[in-house]
Amino acid sequence: KQRVELTPGIDVDAILNDVKQRFAGEQVTDIDGVKIDFADRWVHLRRSNTEPIIRVYAEAHTQAEADALGRELIDIIKASHA
């Protein structure tokens, strides 16, 4: 579990939509955030209702792979609202 700190007032829905479009070739679910299912791993992005953050949950075969997947999505999120 990781998180991305956001600037207050940022359009979180636009960020999540950007991520959703970027991974349109994968199985994407947009219930309670955005979940992207890859063949052997998944990542779930969920906005906080109490803080200006997006929580990033990832699962893969190893903790290192899950951490790397989480960092990849964090980099994408940061780039989309830079």
Locate the predicted segments by residue.
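Phosphate-binding and adjacent anionic-ligand microenvironments
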Residues: 1-82
